[in-house]
Amino acid sequence: MDNVDFATLSIFDIDKEGKQRTDTMPSPDNHREQTKIALFHGGVDKHFYDNGFQVEDDRVTNDTFDGYDMVLLGDIHKRQFLNKEETIAYPGSLIQQNYSEEPSHGFLLWDVEKRKATYHQVENDYGYKIIFVENGLIRNKMKFVPPKGNIKIKYTNTTLEQLKNIQIDLRKKYPKLKDIVTERQDNISIGDDRENKLDISYITDV
């Protein structure tokens, strides 16, 4: 790539207290090329996790990368931009990693000259889906169910028989599902607790 210089702030550059150093970040003035891109794998400034929780890093901030045209970040799995110009960004993980992450994942494709990124989704048949069941009925929308993925059923006020029937229906509709697990959300007794803890993967072939 012509006329582009990359600079990296290493997560291994830490002080005696184990905190991230920023004085090792190369100055953009040391680069002669027209476009200067900074790279870092770690938490920067105010950023969000997939659970919606926001954290703030007071060691590495947006100002750490002043003078760079774009900052490409890693580590945080949630896709987000950290400045209004949208030149400092986490692309997020390439595919969904667990139940806490949203199903939409992919990568950012950068137009270096325009300093703009476009999001491209990567289709994934092996994702994760949480299904909420109340009174024996599925309550959330079923717009996206990974056909070869993992399902977690969170249920309340639902009998064991109702729960098994829901799993049977899911297996019929999505026969290639990898796993279905259940998680009770209330204290209502729905039968023998020992039975509730059984792995009911035997319905895989139904």
Q: What residue spans do the PLM features occupy?
A:
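His/Asp/Glu-rich metal-coordinating catalytic cores
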Residues: 1-88
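A generic structural signal for short, non-catalytic loop/turn and secondary-structure boundary residues
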Residues: 2, 31, 83, 103, ...
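Short, surface-exposed amphipathic charged segments that create phosphate/polyanion-binding patches used
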Residues: 3-11, 105-106, 191-203
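A structural signal for the main folded, soluble domain(s) of proteins
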Residues: 15, 22-29, 38, 84, ...
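Short, surface-exposed beta-edge/turn micro-motifs
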Residues: 35, 104-105, 148-150
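A conserved active-site cap/scaffold subdomain adjacent to cofactor or substrate pockets
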Residues: 70, 74-126, 132-134
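Accessory, non-catalytic peripheral segments of nucleic-acid enzymes
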Residues: 112-206
